[in-house]
């Protein structure tokens, strides 16, 4: 990778750093942000060396009027800055307002573009935001705190593109890009800087590869309507079958391990593409849930490299995990389309959809059949998990007979070792293999490439080869039996949730759909399903199987899962500015600790699908895994659908009140209430009135709550209360 590329990327990433300097009021208010950036360059002093000094030209000269002929690299940043800033909606002579906070783009989904919203994010570091507020200004001290932290960390870490990108993500994700008094301010400074670097690098590579002569700045402008960019989409198919294909022994570890593998696999695939095409993580638009988007240069060389990478990766998957298949497609994009790339996204989504219908080529099918035939005639053993023929099988646990091939054994170990690890590092002696490279989970980074698992403090002595990713790896316990031991009635539950109409949100939710704005929107959703979900899970009797992008799947004691359901919805509403146009549908399904995990996931899918069909923005409660069998499939027999509004305001509130009474109410009263919830007859109502006349105060209160309240999903609530009472009776 050429040194010029790294210089260009770093220059693009810091070109607007003066905007933070101005907001921290470290310069005179009349000083332009292009000059204010000199303060940052001077402050990041490492042993007398100002490490950003070689890049100051990008800070001082990224506006057309400031350009000269001495350094063509600044032209690329200037032009990319203009393209990335095409969403700015300003009026003439409106002036500046440095203290405005970042508007919540989630609160604007489906709303009048010109209308006022009342939802903003405080200017704090990533990881410190919990919800949006109605305060649209911040104090100078808020920005100064961010600035000081950024400068302090910049002095510690080795200066390279990925470290700088991460620092800007950490400290500028909730700082607005624009400093205008008027206009929409819902694009973060971080997203603007990243998209500027993305575009600048792509134009540079396009020009260099095609041998285009750029003798003056205006020559770059001539490329406006040319298909300079290439939108790349990747999709890992077969994930659901893959992650549920686990042994009943150690099922939770294997289930989580396979999910962790997908998280790491997608990141390693992205890095493989970036490495072979010569780009950085600045060119990653989105990655999560086995899906990714990149923006690189539209060259024949890159298109051929993508085909080669896809073929090589699928050959590896065919050997190791035949349930999985990687589909990669690309679509050219003009620089003028950055203002609204929605049509380009639609085209590439359709390409992916069609590609997934023809999962294997003739050559791949022949290779698969040859592999099966070779193994069938050899003296091999069969993996009892994936069915692969192999020369050796392993035990997952000491108390278990051998049953797993090397790959399935690794999936189990992923779930075990990820619990407390800080890094996933390339290691020739490592236990894990992905794409013919070996890796280890470690507490300290190695001298090779290290994937940093989440937001954490980095040792400056080991900051050379870091890639920052985020995996929600919380689990109180690693076995179903341990989770069940702390749960009433030893019953477990799962929560599955998925954002409603995500495609429509990106296609139609915003009138102005620039790349920077879409980037901010997708990053905020990912932020919630990573950082906020992690905070809500910590301390609870749960295990996060996966969470990120726009969905999650969590298992645990049913009481903790139910509490998590309530808290997550409350926090999601606050995070999205109470916008009814942004919602998710969830399923809450109870099961026994011995239940097959594949069946649990199937039930969760069916319950969630039911909620999607019945209006979305709801939770589907299913108690006890009651099933009928049809066409060899388990079908949910009884489910109760509750809107999130009813669940948070009524159902869960009544559940809390009844829970407090569960330890003292006669269980016969609870059982009678259960009958009433199924058949509201006059005789049953009379029985409740009789209970209210009893001397036992708790019985009276319980009966009164049931008789006088309109409770959505009452039967589901009462079954949960009956479980708590049953535990009380069993414990004496």
Language-model segment annotations:
Residues 360-447:
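Cys/His-rich short segments
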Residues 1-10, 20, 34-51, 187-219, ...:
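Alpha-helical phosphate/pyrophosphate-handling elements in metalloenzyme active cores
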Residues 317-326, 350-365, 576-579, 602-627:
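Catalytic/regulatory signature loops of cyclic-dinucleotide turnover enzymes
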Residues 1-124, 174-179, 224, 244-250, ...:
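Divalent metal-dependent catalytic cores for phosphoryl transfer on phosphate-bearing substrates
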Residues 197-207, 260-279, 305-317, 484, ...:
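Alpha-helical scaffold within the catalytic cores of cyclic-nucleotide enzymes
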């Amino acid at each position: 990778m050429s040194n010029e590329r790294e210089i260009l990327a770093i220059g693009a990433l810091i070109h607007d750093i003066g905007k933070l300097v101005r907001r921290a009021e470290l310069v005179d208010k009349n000083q332009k942000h292009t000059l204010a950036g000199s303060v940052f360059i001077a402050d990041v002093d490492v042993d007398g060396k100002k490490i950003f000094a070689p890049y100051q030209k990008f800070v001082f000269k990224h506006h057309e009027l400031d350009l000269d002929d001495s350094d063509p690299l600044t032209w690329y940043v200037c032009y990319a800055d203009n393209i990335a800033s095409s969403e700015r909606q300003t009026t003439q002579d409106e002036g500046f307002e440095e203290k405005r906070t970042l508007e919540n783009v989630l609160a604007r989904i489906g709303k009048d573009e010109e209308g006022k919203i009342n939802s903003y994010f405080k200017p704090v570091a990533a990881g410190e935001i919990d919800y949006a507020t109605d305060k649209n200004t911040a104090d100078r001290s808020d920005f100064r705190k961010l600035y000081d932290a950024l400068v302090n960390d910049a002095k510690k870490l080795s200066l390279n593109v990925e470290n700088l990108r991460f620092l800007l993500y950490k400290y500028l994700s909730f700082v607005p890009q624009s400093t205008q008094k008027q206009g929409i301010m819902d694009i973060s400074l971080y997203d603007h800087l990243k998209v500027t670097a993305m575009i600048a690098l792509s134009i540079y590579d396009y020009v260099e590869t095609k041998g285009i002569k750029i003798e003056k700045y205006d020559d770059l402008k001539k490329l406006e309507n040319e298909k300079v960019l290439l939108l790349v989409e990747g999709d890992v198919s077969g994930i659901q079958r893959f992650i549920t294909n686990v042994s009943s022994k150690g099922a939770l570890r294997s289930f989580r391990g396979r999910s962790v593998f997908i998280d790491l696999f997608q990141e390693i695939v992205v890095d493989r593409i970036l490495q072979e095409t010569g780009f950085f993580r600045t060119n990653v638009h989105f990655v999560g849930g086995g899906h990714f988007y990149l923006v690189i240069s539209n060259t024949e060389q890159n298109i051929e490299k993508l085909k080669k990478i896809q073929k090589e990766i699928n050959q590896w998957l065919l050997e190791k995990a035949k349930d999985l298949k990687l589909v990669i497609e690309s679509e050219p994009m003009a620089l003028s389309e950055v203002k609204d790339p929605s049509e380009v996204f639609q085209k590439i989504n359709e390409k992916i959809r069609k590609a997934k219908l023809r999962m294997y080529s003739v050559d791949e099918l022949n290779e698969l059949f040859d592999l099966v035939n070779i193994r069938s005639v050899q003296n091999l053993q069969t993996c009892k998990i994936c069915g692969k023929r192999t020369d050796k099988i392993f035990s997952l646990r000491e108390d278990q007979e051998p049953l797993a091939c090397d790959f399935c054994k690794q999936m189990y170990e992923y779930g075990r070792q990820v619990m407390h690890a800080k890094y996933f590092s390339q290691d020739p002696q490592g236990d894990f293999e992905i794409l013919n490279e070996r890796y280890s989970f470690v507490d300290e980074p190695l001298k090779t490439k290290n994937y940093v698992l989440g937001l954490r403090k980095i040792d400056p002595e080991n900051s050379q080869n870091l890639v920052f990713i985020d995996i929600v790896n919380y689990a109180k316990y690693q076995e179903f039996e341990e989770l069940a031991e702390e749960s009433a009635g030893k019953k477990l539950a799962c929560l599955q949730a998925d954002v409603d109409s995500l495609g429509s949100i990106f296609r139609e939710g915003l009138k102005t759909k620039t790349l920077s704005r879409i980037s901010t929107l997708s990053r905020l959703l990912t932020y919630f399903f990573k950082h906020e979900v992690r905070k809500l899970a910590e301390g609870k009797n749960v295990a996060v199987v996966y969470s990120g992008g726009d969905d999650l799947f969590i298992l645990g004691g049913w009481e903790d899962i139910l509490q998590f359901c309530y808290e997550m919805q409350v926090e999601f509403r606050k995070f999205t500015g109470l916008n009814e146009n942004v919602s998710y549908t969830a399923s809450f399904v109870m099961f026994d600790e011995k239940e097959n995990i594949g069946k649990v996931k199937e039930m969760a899918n069916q319950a969630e699908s039911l909620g999607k069909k019945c209006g979305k923005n709801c939770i589907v409660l299913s108690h006890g895994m009651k099933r009928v069998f049809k066409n060899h499939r388990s079908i949910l027999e009884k489910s109760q659908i509750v809107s999130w509004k009813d669940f948070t305001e009524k159902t869960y509130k009544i559940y809390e009140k009844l829970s407090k009474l569960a330890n003292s109410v006669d269980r016969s009263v609870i059982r009678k209430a259960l009958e009433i919830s199924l058949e509201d007859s006059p005789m049953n109502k009379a029985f409740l009135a009789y209970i209210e006349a009893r001397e036992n105060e708790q019985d009276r209160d319980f009966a009164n709550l049931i008789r006088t309240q309109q409770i959505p999903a009452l039967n589901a609530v009462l079954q949960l209360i009956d479980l708590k009472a049953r535990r009380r009776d069993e414990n004496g």
